[in-house]
């Protein structure tokens, strides 16, 4: 059985060591023992301090995050609306920071530009200080401009003194126009250039009217020409000219009028000529022209003797379009016997539009019911030649001696 040393008394054989007193222990060093004990207690205290430090650190981190979120929310509210619309949906924190940075850069660039302009203005004022002469010149220019403006305003108000609805906008427009004229230096040229314009507009309708008349301008549907008269028939053209038909003008336009005169067979009229024909001719259809046919003797006379006469139809075998009512001025009454003998086998009725007595004498022996409507000539202007009472009386006597004209028609 093993011995337990603590339970057994010390052996007697061993010498008894003297006991240590408190005074002897005062000089001994126990530092190593103290350090070991101290280190054990420090470890326990550091663990406790970590546990106690975790709680305020969490609070501090939470407060820091709260401050960051609050600042981002304020930046989001301060951002312009056009920057907010660039992104769709909810604005994240990173997006808010990016937009804020972009906006700050734009503001910085704007501020830099403004500062550069301010510096340029300051340097310009410092480099180019106005001297006394420059100030006087500027004052003189200002005074002259003010006087010019005041003069224009007074003139404009004087011109429009009677107008009640005068507006300030009209005055401002007038001043702007005057300033532009002064700057361009063309105040004297513009009235000269603008003056002929109304004349052009006034002349334009007459030109259009002339062009719209077409080739049928001088065409008379009652009396038609086929070709130019010969040299021996100048009296007929003179009579036509004196009657107001414009024979001299028809001589020059004869070639251009021939296709329109020859269109009697095919009825190829232009629009303007058709309108003039409707106004001057009767409304009878072309088939009723057979009522106007003359006797065989008269047809032979038309085809043989007077083929070149300008008062007959276009074709020698075609019956004449109308009876030969010639318009002769009163001064030509001396040639009546020659006309009766040479031009027509019987008496020729003479009619002058300017004389009412001749029309009365003609109506005395002519029945107006028997006269077809195409035979009535349109009223023309009187002859420019002055006719005396002697001529009119001679013409009246000649008309009274004319026998009634045979107007019976064939079926």
Curated annotation (Swiss-Prot):
Residues 142-175 form the Orange domain. Residues 75-79 are annotated as: Necessary for interaction with RXRA and repressor activity against RXRA. There is a cross-link at residues 167, 279, 288 (Glycyl lysine isopeptide (Lys-Gly) (interchain with G-Cter in SUMO2)). SMART domains: HLH, ORANGE. Its main location: cytoplasm. Ubiquitinated; which may lead to proteasomal degradation. Sumoylation inhibits its ubiquitination and promotes its negative regulation of the CLOCK-BMAL1 heterodimer transcriptional activator activity. There is a cross-link at residues 159, 279 (Glycyl lysine isopeptide (Lys-Gly) (interchain with G-Cter in SUMO1, SUMO2 and SUMO3)). Homodimer. Heterodimer with BHLHE41/DEC2. Interacts with TCF3/E47. Interacts with ubiquitin-conjugating enzyme UBE2I/UBC9. Interacts with HDAC1, SUMO1, RXRA and BMAL1. This is Class E basic helix-loop-helix protein 40.
């Amino acid at each position: 059985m093993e011995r337990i040393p603590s339970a057994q008394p010390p052996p007697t054989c061993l010498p008894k060591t003297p006991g240590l007193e408190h005074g002897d222990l005062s000089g001994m060093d126990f530092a190593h023992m103290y350090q070991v004990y101290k280190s054990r207690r420090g470890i326990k205290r550091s663990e406790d301090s970590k546990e106690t430090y975790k709680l305020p650190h969490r609070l501090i981190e939470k407060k820091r995050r709260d401050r960051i979120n609050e600042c981002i929310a304020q930046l989001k509210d301060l951002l312009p609306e056009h920057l907010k619309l660039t992104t769709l949906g909810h604005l994240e924190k990173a997006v808010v920071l990016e937009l804020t940075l972009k906006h700050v850069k734009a503001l910085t660039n704007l501020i830099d530009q403004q500062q550069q302009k301010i510096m340029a203005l300051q340097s310009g004022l410092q480099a180019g200080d106005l001297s006394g002469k420059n100030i006087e010149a500027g004052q003189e220019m200002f005074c002259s401009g003010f006087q010019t403006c005041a003069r224009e305003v007074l003139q404009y108000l004087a011109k429009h003194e009677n107008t009640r609805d005068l507006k300030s906008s009209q005055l401002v427009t007038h001043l702007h126009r005057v300033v532009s004229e002064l700057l361009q230096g063309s105040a004297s040229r513009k009235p000269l250039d603008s003056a002929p314009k109304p004349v052009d507009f006034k002349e334009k309708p007459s030109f259009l009217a002339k062009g719209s008349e077409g080739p049928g301008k001088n065409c008379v549907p009652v009396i038609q020409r086929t070709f130019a008269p010969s040299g021996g028939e100048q009296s007929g053209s003179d009579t036509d000219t004196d009657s107001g038909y414009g024979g001299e003008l028809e001589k020059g336009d004869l070639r251009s009028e021939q296709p329109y005169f020859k269109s009697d067979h095919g009825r190829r009229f232009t629009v303007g000529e058709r309108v003039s024909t409707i106004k001057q001719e009767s409304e009878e259809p072309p088939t009723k022209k057979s009522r106007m046919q003359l006797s065989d003797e008269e047809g032979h006379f038309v085809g043989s003797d007077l083929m070149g006469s300008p008062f007959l139809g276009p074709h020698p075998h075609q019956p004449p379009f109308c009876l030969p009512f010639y318009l002769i001025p009163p001064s030509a009454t001396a040639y009546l016997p020659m006309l009766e003998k040479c031009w027509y086998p019987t008496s020729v009725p003479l009619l002058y539009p300017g004389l009412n007595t001749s029309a009365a004498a003609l109506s005395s022996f002519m029945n107006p019911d028997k006269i077809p409507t195409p035979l009535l000539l349109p009223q023309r202007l009187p002859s420019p030649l002055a006719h005396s009472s002697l001529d009119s009386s001679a013409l009246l006597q000649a008309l009274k001696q004319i026998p009634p004209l045979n107007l019976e028609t064939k079926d």
